[in-house]
């Protein structure tokens, strides 16, 4: 017998293929406080038992491969393997199951969302034994959370920087999103900020195109910020999109924003990538910049109910990677968003401790151990008639981000901003007086129209606008 054969035999190696469930399905396993827990929606191929499918997910996202290998004997699989510890059927779905998987913490590099996702949502999503696979939720243990910096500043620090309390913040995305010159773009920024908004915003696909190079845009927007601040006495900001083709270029743009003295920059965190996002978040914390996050590309990943990844997971990942704002849907606007599910991940963004609540899609209790919170941004097809609902749904710690709902005002950009601000102030005052925004919202807006012609004009323009389409990604049991 050759020395190599003797080595393989001595570690108990037996070539061949064995069922995943013999090693990776462990219903007797008691999860540890340090485990990362995952809830997967599994749709096995016909003939594949759910236990085998769940075990395959645990194996292929941790230590397993398609066949037995002799190097298994050179490490402790019991220490490092993922374990499918529970499987439950999905109500109303005969072919779908929720498989719960526990991962030992040592499988993941500290402070790296990139590494965590490479394992948990990597090659396993193309596994042939599965017709579809979706990651519904993750439990991030405090031991892992503490290896991340998280948001550069967080909700309270942002309010202190801006000196704005007791109400949602107001924003506006400059439109048209592409094609304006830098000077005309800066003019629109100035008019919106002067009219009463707290922020204006680059659209997600505004980077540095031939019609408007980034440096010109930054300069004209900075001028607009300082001019509007001088005229209103309020602190203003514009989300300057630093997203670029390389991390080095992205940081260069953030450095220039800091040199201009503006308060906030922006990043497209999914198209830019988690490594770039975490690097930018670290820079922003070290240099006093707030960081606005856009979620462009999220619907490619999260919209289909049986495959991909739910946005609550992307939201948790962003809180770890770092961002002070993130777009979170509106419930009432033009973009996808179920109310209970949206409120669930809004709490996961803002709160320090969130209890398990399956009625809102929260599969695990999440303790953030004082990691700073993230402001959810409601954006997409909203206007003044939505203000009572938005104020009631999202509360004070949020950003209500208009676009066409400001710039589409018949009298111009500044009157559009005035209408937004008046509607918000009316809703906040009514709420503070004990009125029910959900019931009396339209009446509150009509009353405010009596002393704001700008709001009255906006209400007339958008009184018939509706986006009455069913939500595709509903919580189980809501069909």
UniProtKB/Swiss-Prot annotation:
Which terms in the Gene Ontology molecular function aspect does this entry carry? magnesium ion binding; monooxygenase activity; ribulose-bisphosphate carboxylase activity
Q: What is its EC number?
A: 4.1.1.39
What UniProt keywords apply to this chain's record, in alphabetical order? Calvin cycle, Carbon dioxide fixation, Chloroplast, Disulfide bond, Lyase, Magnesium, Metal-binding, Monooxygenase, Oxidoreductase, Phosphoprotein, Photorespiration, Photosynthesis, Plastid
Task: Using the UniProt record, name the top-level EC class of this enzyme in a single word.
Answer: lyase
Q: Which positions correspond to the propeptide? A: 1-2
* Residues with PTM Phosphoserine: 208
The record's section on InterPro entries has: RuBisCO, RuBisCo_large_chain_AS, RuBisCO_lsu_C, RuBisCO_lsu_C_sf, RuBisCO_lsu_fd_N, RuBisCO_lsu_N_sf, RuBisCO_lsuI
Q: Where is this site: Transition state stabilizer?
A: 334
- Give the chief site where it resides: plastid
Q: What catalytic reaction does the record list?
A: 2 (2R)-3-phosphoglycerate + 2 H(+) = D-ribulose 1,5-bisphosphate + CO2 + H2O; D-ribulose 1,5-bisphosphate + O2 = 2-phosphoglycolate + (2R)-3-phosphoglycerate + 2 H(+)
Please identify the protein, giving its name as recorded: Ribulose bisphosphate carboxylase large chain
């Amino acid at each position: 017998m050759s020395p190599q054969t003797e080595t393989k035999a001595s570690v108990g190696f037996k070539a061949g293929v064995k069922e995943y469930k013999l090693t990776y399905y462990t219903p007797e396993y008691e999860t540890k406080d340090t485990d990362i827990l995952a809830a997967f929606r599994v749709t096995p191929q016909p003939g594949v038992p759910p236990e085998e499918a769940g075990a395959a997910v645990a194996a292929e996202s941790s230590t397993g491969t398609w066949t037995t290998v002799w190097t298994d004997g050179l490490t402790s699989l019991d220490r490092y393997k993922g374990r499918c510890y529970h499987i439950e059927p999905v109500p109303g779905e005969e072919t779908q199951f929720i498989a719960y998987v526990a991962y030992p913490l040592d499988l993941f590099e500290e402070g790296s969302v990139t590494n965590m996702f490479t394992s948990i949502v990597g090659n396993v999503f193309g596994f042939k034994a599965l017709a579809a696979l979706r990651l519904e939720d993750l439990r991030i243990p405090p031991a892992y959370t503490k290896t991340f910096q998280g948001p550069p500043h967080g909700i309270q620090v942002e309010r202190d920087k801006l000196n704005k309390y007791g109400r949602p913040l107001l924003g506006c995305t400059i439109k048209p999103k592409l094609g304006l010159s830098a000077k005309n773009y800066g003019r629109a920024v100035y008019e919106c900020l002067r009219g009463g908004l707290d922020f204006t915003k680059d659209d997600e696909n505004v980077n540095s195109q031939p019609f408007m190079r980034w440096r010109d845009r930054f300069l004209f927007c900075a001028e607009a910020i300082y001019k509007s601040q001088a005229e209103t006495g309020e602190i203003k900001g514009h989300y300057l999109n630093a997203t670029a083709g390389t991390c080095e270029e992205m940081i260069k743009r953030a450095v220039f924003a800091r040199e201009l003295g503006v308060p906030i920059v922006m990043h497209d965190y999914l198209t830019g990538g988690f490594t770039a996002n975490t690097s930018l978040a670290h820079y922003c914390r070290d240099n006093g910049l707030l960081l606005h996050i856009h979620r462009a590309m999220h619907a490619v990943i999260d919209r289909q109910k049986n495959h991909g990844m739910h946005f609550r997971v992307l939201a948790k990942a962003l809180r770890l990677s770092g961002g002070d704002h993130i777009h979170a849907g509106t419930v009432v606007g033009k973009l996808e968003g179920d109310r209970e599910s949206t409120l669930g991940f809004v709490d996961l963004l803002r709160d320090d401790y969130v209890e398990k609540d399956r009625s809102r899609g929260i599969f695990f209790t999440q303790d953030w151990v004082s990691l700073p919170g993230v402001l959810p941004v409601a954006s997409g097809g909203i206007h003044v008639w939505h203000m009572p609902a938005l104020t009631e749904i999202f509360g004070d710690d949020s950003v209500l981000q208009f676009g066409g709902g400001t710039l589409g005002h018949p009298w111009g950009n500044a009157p559009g901003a005035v209408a937004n601000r008046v509607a918000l102030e009316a809703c906040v005052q009514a709420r503070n007086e004990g009125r029910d925004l959900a019931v009396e919202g339209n009446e509150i807006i009509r009353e405010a129209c009596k002393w704001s012609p700008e709001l009255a004009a906006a209400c007339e323009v958008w009184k018939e606008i509706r986006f009455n389409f069913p939500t595709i990604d509903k919580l189980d049991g809501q069909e």
